[in-house]
């Protein structure tokens, strides 16, 4: 069960795709989803999630400023669950991932977000959605230590 927001001209195609995928979402599930929306539970839940993710985003931003070496830069997203960070010194984040994993931290190298993998060699996507704030701080600290070591700082 889900919803989509799209131009009206595309809606028929999406309905057909949904019908082709599973024929019909169960009626009971539809009634429950409708009740959740009508009573405001979904709106309340989304509001709570926004607060949680904002705290985690802000925690990551603060930790980056505290623990990462000079020359690194990152986005300050207004939405989503990820930060985009760039590192200096010719570090290829595909290769650096091995050092990060040794420090028990993972990220997605930036190159994987380029269609021909022809860019983003110095970039990484960092996820703040899953971990609690204290884990985010520790992970960013560990990455900072590894980056400083890789840069000889």
PLM features: residue spans?
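PLP-dependent class I/II
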Residues: 1-153
């Amino acid at each position: 069960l889900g919803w989509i927001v799209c131009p009206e001209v595309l809606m028929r195609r999406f309905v057909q795709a949904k019908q082709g995928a599973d024929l019909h979402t169960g009626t009971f599930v539809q009634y429950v989803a409708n009740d959740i929306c009508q009573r405001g539970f979904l709106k309340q839940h989304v509001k709570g999630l926004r607060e949680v993710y904002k705290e985690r985003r802000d925690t990551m931003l603060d930790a980056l400023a505290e623990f990462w070496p000079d020359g690194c830069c990152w986005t300050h997203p207004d939405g989503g669950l990820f930060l985009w960070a760039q590192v200096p010194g010719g570090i290829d984040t595909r290769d650096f991932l091995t050092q990060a994993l040794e420090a028990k931290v993972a990220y997605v190298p930036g190159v994987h977000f380029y269609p021909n993998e022809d860019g983003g060699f110095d970039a990484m996507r960092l996820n703040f959605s899953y971990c609690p704030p204290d884990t985010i701080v520790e992970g960013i600290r560990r990455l900072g230590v590894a980056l400083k070591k890789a840069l000889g700082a």
